[in-house]
A protein has these predicted regions:
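Carbohydrate-active catalytic/glycan-binding domains of CAZyme proteins
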Residues: 1-113
């Protein structure tokens, strides 16, 4: 059996996910967080993405894709607001709730899947 080594950071060097929030759903760990862009003049300018790994293999992470585009929020149709520090919860109804803060506005947003 080939051994893999875990590194810190565990995501690829091109991926910047500060404020990471890990959650176990089923047999996978999902990491949600703000999404920075290399060389950008501000933080949290990208849409939200998610990475996951099997709870049995935290060395092999998979890109789950974009989970929420900042322009999807009705208060941010132009995409001018930055979204900070997201977190996810699974509701009793089985749906997933993505909570996020708008930059410097004192408001929270929620998206439901």
């Amino acid at each position: 059996m080939e051994e893999k080594q875990a590194f810190n950071p565990f995501l690829p060097e091109y991926e910047y996910i500060p404020d990471g929030e890990p959650h176990v759903f089923g047999d996978r760990v999902y990491v949600y967080g703000s999404h920075d862009k290399f060389g950008a003049p501000m933080f949290c300018v990208n849409d939200y993405v998610c990475w996951s790994a099997s709870v049995d293999d935290l060395k092999s992470w998979s890109f789950e894709g974009v989970i929420y585009r900042k322009r999807q929020d009705p208060k941010n149709r132009l995409g001018l607001r930055l979204l900070f520090a997201p977190d996810v919860a699974r509701g009793k109804d089985g749906r997933y709730y993505l909570y996020y803060a708008f930059d410097f506005m004192g408001m929270m947003g929620v998206a439901v899947s």
